[in-house]
Amino acid sequence: MKIRFMMLFGLLTLPVLAWAADALTGDVQRQPLNIQAIVMFLLFVGGTLYITYWASKKTRSRSDYYTAGGNITGFQNGLAIAGDYMSAASFLGISALVYTSGYDGLIYSLGFLVGWPIILFLIAERLRNLGRYTFADVASYRLQQRPIRSLSACGSLVVVALYLIAQMVGAGKLIELLFGLNYHVAVILVGILMVMYVMFGGMLATTWVQIIKAVLLLFGATFMAVMVMKSVGFSFDALFKQAMAVHPKGASIMSPGGLVSDPISALSLGLGLMFGTAGLPHILMRFFTVSDAKEARKSVFYATGFMGYFYFLTFIIGFGAILLVSANPEFKDATGALIGGNNMAAVHLADAVGGDFFLGFISAVAFATILAVVAGLTLAGASAVSHDLYSNVIKKGKATERDELKVSKITVLVLGVVAISLGILFENQNIAFMVGLAFSIAASCNFPIIIISMYWSKLTTRGAMIGGWAGLLTAVILMILGPTIWVKILGHATPIYPYDYPALFSMLVAFIGIWFFSITDRSEAGQQERARFHAQFVRSQTGVGASKGSSH
């Protein structure tokens, strides 16, 4: 293990050496090399690689690899979920949205948060009692294993791929800007670290990377918010009045409605964000890392608290950037635009309130944020291939633990190569729609199957398959025919589907398809699946027979 670790660490130093060489001949558009940021980044990488080495010693079984043996506490898992969910897009994107649009930014952040009560009250407990490693365990509990797991794995992999592309491109652009590092080198560096964390440390290393990132991000955001409030005498009234006085839009930044052009787009976006959260495979997988349903509920309670606090801070940070960044010519280029674009508002604010040292800290935290999210995504993708497709579909449940883990680690390596390749391929593409599409597919395929399989006794395999595939394909087709891809990317004059987000219609297709093709299923298999609901209901409520945490 030590030899393999040293070889991979050697591989890791190649991009760093390239980075050092590149800094001398770098593109003038990039930021100058930030020594504080590099030192903190190297400290973070060193610390997390040590955690990965420690985790690799404790990861002996399939349960250890997928779920950290089920030994994570509710509080730890709450922090890890927050670390998994609070992406760089949340930190930089929402504060940038507040910086440009004011109150609308808060509404957008609520969209990410409002899905969590659904998970707390409807999903967390039953998911933990019925599942073992992936959400497909739950969806296929009383239905036919092979078709349902195939659909769930496809839904998971599509969501993971889209989310991963968005994160990798975002990572490359962000690191290029923050560290003065070449885009391709940045993407390769993120890919190598991601593979190392997941391949060697499994869920235990991924969990602790996410916990450390969440603590660092919450600390950094708190410090920034406190410094912003200190500058206005800790008065929200003064903060908003001064922001309105400085902002080009004036008082209109305090009113909603500027984000979406019509109510259908608003509803579709809201539904995608709300229900998509409850269908994200890397989030659902985290509920199997705790010992029982009680700890799963605690996880959501703590995670919602941490994330609610964080999104509240981004609102203050956004308004702080209006005050302290937009009025400061030091952060503007020759045309009067923000250096690095509006997404850099929070990073410039870190410089304004804490100087070079704190700017370095926030830059390193932004990098940590990306690594934590891509590690979670990679593990979710690998488990969908190894546990759902290989073990239960191809081998029909007869695969050995050793073979399943081997397939999982090979998949991690493949996902790493694919993520790096797609990150480089999509360098100059608009990747914002990919996150929207990932949420829409999660809301249109994964969520309907999970929620209906848990609560509706008349569901059959036929209904789940037809409805699930219909929801997934409708989401993808409507997104392609919509304004983002059909007009902006493919160059057509007008979109066939006029709205940006498909969730409103694709979710409807999924639910109607599942309902109709289940109630019209008169087969013997369908009758048996309905009869098995009672046993599933008892286990989902009591936890009798559910997998427990392993002790080491």
UniProtKB/Swiss-Prot annotation:
Biological processes annotated in GO = plasma membrane acetate transport; sodium ion transport
Give all cystine bridges in this chain: none
Q: Which InterPro entries match?
A: Cation/Ac_symporter_ActP, Na/Glc_symporter_sf, Na/solute_symporter, Na/solute_symporter_CS, Sodium:Solute_Symporter
GO CC terms in record: plasma membrane
Q: Which HAMAP family match?
A: Acet_symport_ActP
Family per UniProt?
Belongs to the sodium:solute symporter (SSF) (TC 2.A.21) family.
Tell me the function of this protein: Transports acetate.
What is the protein name given in its UniProt record?
Cation/acetate symporter ActP
Query: Per the annotation, which location comes first and is thus the protein's main one?
Result: membrane
Q: Which gene encodes it?
A: actP
Name its species: Pectobacterium carotovorum subsp. carotovorum (strain PC1)
Tell where it localizes.
Cell inner membrane
Question: Topologically, how does it sit relative to the membrane?
Answer: Multi-pass membrane protein
